[in-house]
């Protein structure tokens, strides 16, 4: 059993509308621009395409959109190798296209969040080119080392560190006659945050885009920002993990010298201070989201420490990292509770079930459970983050090696690429049953469109009597009401593989959500067994595809079964359950 009282849960009807800032119960949508909508027919999504579809995002209930990287890039890692932080990638448009997008967001009341990639740049960036030549102030913008001289006079890297993308994390540069560090591709040299000039320049990047009206940033690859310092003219080797015999695989080492260094958190706090400067000017809160696949204690440090504030939304990857198709109700509860048990007082929860680096929900957790997980995402406390296409139940599209473009897959080779390639979860958005699913008029798109697009698309689901999309819209509308914005949480499991949780606000009412992780029907009598004070009759708010009971109908819970791998949202109101209006 888990009980959890979110911040401000006791605020009731009088004045509760002023209790929440816009992000505190926000619904955020990750747009992968390359795959969202192509406006000019070249097979690649772009900013004008995103602008064209903003009304759709408003209609599905979003409060903010997070754009994966849109800055100038040679595209060695599809935008995560930035060659100019102050300009837009030409394939996506230009600054004028960005201004159009920003203006339309403001018109629709959508907040715009940009992906900030601070750990590294492209090796084509002017910073790097000038650092190679030792032109100040760029000389120490990157992590350089002359290497270790061997007895025969040859050079070796200054440590055994391994890149995320396999092989040594050190690359020799002939012009500078030194090694540079790259924790990702060799085309992505690591920036040196021990250099004060670099720290100030990256703050200038944030300020540039804040001055253009963005509402915040998602910070990429945060645990990698700092490495340990040199000891006796070399870096400390990382210990062997014993997890694999493959010495090229990053899992070969325990990354205690290249991740989660103490200085990382102070850098996050410094960036938050930049955002707060802008918030103070106009009382419009700017937010920070952080990406960190690291331990729970480390993630929680991103929130802040003492008087220092950090990210409002350190991404909660517990379910992405740990749940699979075979996961049970107990597994779901374990990872929900692990997050909630460690959440610092006064901080907001967030729930992330998909992104561009992981298999889609249907492929990772089971197609039959797509609705179940979307119901959970939209009814758990506080913030929800949705990856594009998950609202219609898009699934991974198998892609042959000769059409693979993801460097992680290509570097693994034709035998193992399917274990590493992220391309299957990045295919074009499926808008309708027209050519290329309505994504593009091009003869060839940058990645193949999923073969199921004729049946699975936005237009078809909008027209269907019951669909993933219609359920998603109903959920995002309902979650703006007071029970889900302010209700406490009481989460339980049963031996029959059910998760049940209750969200309640005194004098307003309560919601009960039931998730059936079994593949067999289960009686909703479990509601009364787990919550003895619950009513015999409850009203259906929403349900997954296999549930035949119509929304708004009243049911006797003791007489009702929930189909396998399905979910249902029920309510009992004692008074008005109004929509909560957010502050700036």
Swiss-Prot record:
Presence of keyword Amino-acid biosynthesis: no
Key words of the record: Glycoprotein, Glycosidase, Hydrolase, Secreted, Signal
Gene3D superfamilies (UniProt xref): Glycosidases, Oligo-1,6-glucosidase, Domain 2
Thermoactivity: Optimum temperature is 35.0 degrees Celsius. Active from 30 to 60 degrees Celsius.
Notes on activation and inhibition: Inhibited by Hg(2+), Pb(2+), acarbose and d-gluconic acid delta-lactone.
CDD domains given in the database record: AmyAc_maltase
Enzyme Commission number(s): 3.2.1.20
pH-activity profile: Optimum pH is 5.5. Active from pH 3.0 to 8.0.
Tissue: Saliva (at protein level). Proximal lateral lobes of the salivary gland (at protein level).
Bilayer-crossing regions: none
InterPro entries tied to this protein: Glyco_hydro_13_cat_dom (IPR006047), Glycoside_hydrolase_SF (IPR017853), O16G_dom_2 (IPR045857)
Extent of the signal sequence: 1-19
Cystine connections: none
SMART domains assigned to the protein according to its UniProt record, in alphabetical order: Aamy (SM00642)
Record-linked SUPFAM superfamilies: (Trans)glycosidases (SSF51445)
Modification comment: Glycosylated.
A single GO BP: carbohydrate metabolic process
A Pfam cross-reference name: Alpha-amylase
Chain positions carrying an annotated carbohydrate: 119, 256, 283, 402, 516
Function of the protein: Functions as a glucosidase that shows high activity toward sucrose, a major component of nectar, as well as maltotriose. Assists the mosquito in its sugar-feeding capabilities.
PANTHER family assigned: ALPHA-AMYLASE FAMILY MEMBER, MALTASE A1
Family: Belongs to the glycosyl hydrolase 13 family.
Protein name: Salivary alpha-glucosidase
Organism for this UniProt entry: Culex quinquefasciatus
Upper taxonomic lineage: Eukaryota, Metazoa, Ecdysozoa, Arthropoda, Hexapoda
């Amino acid at each position: 059993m888990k009980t959890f009282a979110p911040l401000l849960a006791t605020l009731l009807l009088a004045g509760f509308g002023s209790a929440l800032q816009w992000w505190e119960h926000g619904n955020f949508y990750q747009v992968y621009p390359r795959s969202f909508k192509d406006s000019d027919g070249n097979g690649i999504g772009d900013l004008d395409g995103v602008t064209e579809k903003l009304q759709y995002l408003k209609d599905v209930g979003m409060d903010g959109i997070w754009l994966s990287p849109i800055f100038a890039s040679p595209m060695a890692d599809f935008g995560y190798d930035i060659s100019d932080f102050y300009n837009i990638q030409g394939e996506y448009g230009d600054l004028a296209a960005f201004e159009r997008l920003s203006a339309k967001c403001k018109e629709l009341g959508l907040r715009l969040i940009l992906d900030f990639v601070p750990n590294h740049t492209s090796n084509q960036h002017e910073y790097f080119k000038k650092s190679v030549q030792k032109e100040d102030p760029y000389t120490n913008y990157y992590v350089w080392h002359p290497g270790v001289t061997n007895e025969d006079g040859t050079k070796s890297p200054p440590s055994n560190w391994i890149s995320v993308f396999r092989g040594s994390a050190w690359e020799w540069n002939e012009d500078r006659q030194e090694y540079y560090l790259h924790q990702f591709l060799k085309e992505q040299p690591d920036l040196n945050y021990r250099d004060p000039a670099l720290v100030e320049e990256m703050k200038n990047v944030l300020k540039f885009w804040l001055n253009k009206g963005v509402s915040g940033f998602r910070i990429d690859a945060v645990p990698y920002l700092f490495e340990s310092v040199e000891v006796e003219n070399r870096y400390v080797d990382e210990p062997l993990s014993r997890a694999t015999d493959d010495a090229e695989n990053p899992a070969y080492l325990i990354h205690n010298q290249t991740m989660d260094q103490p200085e990382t958190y102070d850098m996050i706090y410094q960036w938050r201070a930049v955002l707060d400067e802008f918030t103070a000017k106009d009382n419009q809160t700017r937010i920070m989201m952080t990406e960190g696949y690291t331990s729970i204690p480390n993630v929680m440090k991103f929130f802040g420490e003492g008087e220092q504030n950090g990210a409002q939304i350190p991404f909660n990857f517990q379910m992405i990292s740990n749940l699979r198709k075979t996961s049970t109700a107990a597994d779901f509860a374990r990872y929900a509770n692990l997050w909630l048990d460690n959440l610092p007082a006064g901080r907001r929860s967030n729930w992330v079930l998909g992104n561009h680096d992981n298999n889609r929900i249907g492929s990772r957790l089971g197609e039959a459970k797509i609705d179940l997980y979307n119901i959970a995402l939209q009814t758990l406390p506080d913030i929800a983050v949705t990856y594009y296409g998950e609202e219609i139940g898009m699934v991974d599209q198998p892609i042959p090696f000769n059409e693979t473009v993801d460097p992680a897959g290509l570097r693994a080779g034709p035998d193992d690429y399917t274990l590493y390639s992220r391309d299957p979860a990045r295919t074009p958005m499926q808008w309708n049953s027209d050519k290329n699913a309505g994504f593009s008029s091009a003869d060839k798109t940058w990645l193949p469109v999923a073969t199921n697009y004729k049946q699975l698309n936005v237009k078809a689901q909008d027209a269907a009597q019951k669909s993933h999309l219609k359920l998603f819209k109903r959920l995002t509308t309902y979650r703006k009401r007071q029970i889900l914005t302010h209700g406490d949480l009481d989460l339980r499991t049963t031996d029959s593989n059910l998760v049940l949780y209750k969200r309640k606000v005194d004098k307003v009412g309560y919601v009960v959500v039931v998730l059936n992780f079994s593949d067999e029907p289960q009686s909703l009598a479990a509601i009364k067994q787990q919550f003895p004070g619950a009513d015999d009759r409850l009203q259906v708010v929403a349900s997954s595809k296999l549930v035949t009971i119509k929304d708004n109908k009243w049911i006797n819970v003791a007489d009702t079964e929930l189909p396998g791998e399905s979910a249902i949202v029920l309510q009992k109101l004692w008074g008005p359950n109004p929509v909560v209006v957010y502050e700036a």
